Amino acid sequence: MKCLIVGCGYVGLPLGAELARLGHEVWGLRRSAVVEDEFKAAGIRPFVADITKPDGLAGLPHDFEWVVNCIASSGGSAENYRRIYLHGMSRLIEWFSASPPKKFVYTSSTSVYGQTDGSTVKETSLTAPSAETAKVLLETERLLLTAVREQKFPAVILRVAAIYGPGRGVWFKQFLKNEACIEGDGSRILNMIHRDDVIGCIIAALRNGRPGEIYNAVDDEPVSQATFFHWLAGELRRDLPPAAPENWAENRKRGVTNKRVSNRKLKMELGYQFKYPDFRSGYTAEILQLEQAGKLPE
């Protein structure tokens, strides 16, 4: 297949490398100047473009068979999200409308679920987020689903949980820096997925995803905050994080949610088997790599 990866960053670059390894022709689109050696080593043909600009895709071929939009925002404001995700998606749909790919996969986020009661959510659950950035992501999903209905655009949506892996993992990094805290009784649920499994889920969606469908990309074991930090403390022989201050939630830029995201549909319909089915297996691998590289803080 001739593939286009829109957003060759933390997920997109290794995704492109894996697709190239599988024998596909891979193009990688990035807003900023690319590091030629990095792309060449991954087997990716670079293309510099800005999907937020009216003519930003000029010169890009129309004949891709698989397209993945896994672009990431460079800033956290709702307006920046709107520019990158919503406006960018609109231009991609317009660009490929005359000659659609066989499959178009968009990586959205489980933040579109605004539940705060610890309930289990699936793809048909209510999406009513309080965070402005999550509202933009939901609006982007709806734009894409409209194109599916009205134009038969072959799009599949993956709602991706908090990604961790090499150099990434917000709660893990906070723990290592002694900046983590436990909220209340620690019962708030954390939903995670290793980067390798994000890549695996995207490829499964390209192969088996049905246009117009949404799939939650999250590991098998959403975990309470207390359980997660107790495990880390035991593995790394460190103290537990302190209790969060009373005004902790008020100081967060993003809304605080508490939900248990189900991956049942993704596993059943896409047939994907997780490399790291829970946080223990994933973080055991990450901790080992840090130890071997001498990068694990004392």
Regions found by a protein language model. Give the residues of each.
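Conserved C-terminal active-site "lid" loop/helix of NAD(P)H-dependent oxidoreductases
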Residues: 230, 250-273
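A conserved pocket-lining segment of Rossmann-fold NAD(P)-dependent short-chain dehydrogenase/reductase
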Residues: 173-193
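Glycine/proline-rich active-site loop of Rossmann-fold NAD(P)-dependent oxidoreductases
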Residues: 138, 150-153, 163-173, 183, ...
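Amphipathic terminal alpha-helices
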Residues: 278-298
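NAD(P)-cofactor binding segment of oxidoreductase domains
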Residues: 64-105
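Conserved Rossmann-fold NAD(P)-dependent oxidoreductase catalytic core, especially the SDR/UDP-sugar
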Residues: 91-132
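Catalytic helix-loop patch of NAD(P)-dependent Rossmann-fold dehydrogenases
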Residues: 117-157
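Mid/C-terminal beta-alpha module of Rossmann-like enzyme folds, strongest
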Residues: 201, 208-251, 297-298
